[in-house]
Amino acid sequence: MSVTIDPRRHDAVLFDTALNSTQALVRQLQQARVGTATFASGGGGHDAAIQALTESADRVGARPGRCVVITADAASVAAARDSGFALVIGVDQAGHRDALPDHGADTVLADLDEVRVRAGDRHMSELPDALQALGRPDGLTVPRPAVFFDFDGTLSEIVDDPDAATPTAGAVAALQQLAAQCPVAILSGRDLADVSQRVGLPGIWYAGSHGFELTAPDGTHHQNEAAAAAIPVLEQAAAQLRDRLGSIPGVMVEHKRFGVATHYRNAARDRVGEIAAVVRAAGQRDGLRVTTGREVIELRPDIDWDKGKTLRWVIDHLPDQRAAPLVPIYLGDDITDEDAFDAVGPNGVAIMVRHNEDGDRATAALFALESPARVAEFTGRLASQLSTLG
C-alpha cells in the first residue's frame, strides 16, 4: 500500500523525530515545494503531544488542515487526529500496526518508501490569465468545447451564508449564450435541486453532490444507486454533528441528500481543529469519506466518485462525437475541482478561479481567472467567439 502527499492539498509534512530514514522523502517534498518540520513524540501526555504538533505546524507556517503528520507513535497519531490535521500516516517501526489505526491513523505503512509525492503542478500565481489567452493561436483556442462550471466561488462569490449565494451579475445570461453554442454543465457540491434552482437555466446539465445526482438537458434524472444506500447513515451523522458542534458559534452543519457539510467560515480560528477532528471522527465511525473545501469539511458516501468522474461520465453521454470529439473545459476554484482538472486530460483545459484562502497552493489548472465576475466575462466572450465560427 502507498499513500500520496499532494501539494494541492498539503502545504507541509511534520515528521516524528523517532522515524528512520526520512532524508529521501524530505528531498522529494522540498522539490515539490512542500514544507517540512519535525516534532518529538513520547512523554508529556495528550495535551503536550497536541502542543508539539501545533507548534511544529506554526514553525513551517501551515495550518493543521493542510498538514500531514507522519509518526510511529500511537499517542501522536491520536493527538494529530484530535487537532484536525489533514492526513495522519502511521509508520509501523515496532510491530504495533493495529494500535495506529485504532488511535486514528488514516493509513499505516511499513516504511517511508511507500510515500509518494505528487509533482508537476504549478502554483496559482504562476498561471496565465484565461481571458488574455482566449482566442490567441498560442493561447486558448477550442473550436468544439464542452464547458463545465463549479458554482460556489466560480459562478457565485463565496459568501458567509451559503443560502445567500447567487450567480454573479451577467453569469446566467452568459451561460445561456454559451449553451446555444456548445454543451454546458454545472457541477456543484450543493444538492441537485439547490444548484439547479439557483442557476435556473433550462437545457443544460446539472450535477449535484459532486456528481452523485444529475439531470440531463432533457430533464432525465440519474443518480448513483450505491451512494443512495448511504442516505440514512448521512442523516444520522448530520444529527450527531449538530449535537456535537451546535454549541460552537459560527458553525453550520448542512445536511444534503448525499452529504453532510460542516461550514466553519464564521467560527473562531482556534476552534477549527476541534471542528475538523469531530467531523473526521464521525466519518471514521460511520464509514463515510471525508473531504475538504474552502472553510468546509464534508462527509460523503465512501465511493470512488468525484467531479472528475462525473465530467467523464457526462462527456461519454453527449451526442455522437466520432467526427470531431468535444474538448472539455472546466472552471473551478476549490480543492474538489482538482479532480475535474485532472479529468479533462492533456487535450482539455482546466481554469482555476483564484483566491487566497489556501495561500498560493499548487493546482493542476493551466489557466486562471481572478474572480467569478471574470468567469462571467470569459463565458460571454467564449460564446461570442464560438458563434462567429458558426
From Swiss-Prot:
InterPro entries: HAD-like_sf, HAD-SF_hydro_IIB, HAD_sf, OTSB-like, Trehalose_PPase. The active site is at residue 150. Gene3D superfamilies: HAD superfamily/HAD-like, Trehalose-6-phosphate phosphatase related protein, domain 2. Its cofactor is Mg(2+). Its EC number is 3.1.3.12. GO terms for biological process: trehalose biosynthetic process. Mg(2+) binds at residues 150, 152, 333. The keyword Magnesium applies. It holds the Pfam family Trehalose_PPase. The keyword Metal-binding applies. Transmembrane segments: none annotated. NCBIfam families: HAD-SF-IIB, T6PP. Belongs to the trehalose phosphatase family. This is Trehalose-phosphate phosphatase. It comes from Mycobacterium marinum (strain ATCC BAA-535 / M). The gene is otsB.
